[in-house]
Amino acid sequence: MTGCNKTQLYLTTIAVILLTASQAAEAHFKNLCAQTAYPRLCWPIVKGPNPRRATHSTIRALETKTKLAIAQAARYKNGNQQVAICYATLKDAAFNLGKARRSIRKRNVLSLKMFLAAAVSDYGVCVNGFIDSRQVHTIQNAADKLRKMGSNCLLLATLIR
């Protein structure tokens, strides 16, 4: 009877350790996005606890959404000076995101942060231009969301070791 209790205790201990480890991993994943300024924009993109992969996934999502915003701005840039400015800054942001993606592959965290900061700045120029000119446009909304996602990405990049 004593041998059976030891086996049960051993199996129970293993089960508790595995459960605790899985909860810790899940908590770390949730904490990765919880640390960002805009966690609701982070959770759909980040799929794990690795900051490097999270940053890479966010850069790819930013590139995709930036291309869509560029296409949208291209339709309206001839009729609105502020949209034309946004079009140019979105193109700059796309360039900086490409450089950031290459930097993460080369494991150059300093360059990665620099290019991400430049992209966030580009998005901010677009948003602030609309605010300064007292205009409201769908491009502004897209650029604001991109700015927030870029801010999250920049924070994720600081977690890379």
Residue ranges and their predicted role:
Residues 2-111, 115-161:
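Trafficking entry modules
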